[in-house]
Amino acid sequence: MQFLILAAGKPSLGYAKEGVELYLNRLRPFGKTELKLVRDGSSQDVSKRLLAASEGCLRIAMDERGELWTTRKLVDLAKDWQMHSVRRIAFLIGASDGHTEELRSRCNHILSLSKFTLQHELALVVLLEQLYRCHTILAGTPYHR
């Protein structure tokens, strides 16, 4: 199972750059997690690029209007995806204006990380940390305790 994180624009804030690098490095031993950055722009343009880059994947749009999951739910879904041989799961983080309705309608899940609206670079770091936490739980390593 491969996690693909697709995000609009390159992180420019120092904490985001450091957080992205930290969690991508921590995720490496667990297998394939890939971050792909698409060119930033209007919601319409970014949504088209995100949909094209996630073709063939189970899609999860990161959106403030989405469902709130616990870490345990993410772990349970990851187990289910493994059991059903889902090969690629794409998490889509849009531009600052969010996703289009078309993109949301073409996703398997809509996920919110918080009831707060999160700046998209912060959302990227939080998502990577949760994916790392998910992997440690699945592997039985102590990070999550």
UniProtKB/Swiss-Prot annotation:
Pfam families: SPOUT_MTase. Its EC number is 2.1.1.177. S-adenosyl-L-methionine binds at G94. Belongs to the RNA methyltransferase RlmH family. One of its GO terms (cellular component) is cytoplasm. InterPro entries: Alpha/beta_knot_MTases, RlmH-like, tRNA_m1G_MTases_N. Keywords: Cytoplasm, Methyltransferase, rRNA processing, S-adenosyl-L-methionine, Transferase. Homodimer. HAMAP family: 23SrRNA_methyltr_H. The keyword rRNA processing applies. It is found in: Cytoplasm. This is Ribosomal RNA large subunit methyltransferase H. It comes from the Bacteria. It is an enzyme of class 2 (transferase). It catalyses: pseudouridine(1915) in 23S rRNA + S-adenosyl-L-methionine = N(3)-methylpseudouridine(1915) in 23S rRNA + S-adenosyl-L-homocysteine + H(+). One of its GO terms (molecular function) is rRNA (pseudouridine-N3-)-methyltransferase activity. Specifically methylates the pseudouridine at position 1915 (m3Psi1915) in 23S rRNA. CDD domains: RlmH-like (cd18081). The keyword Nuclease does not apply.
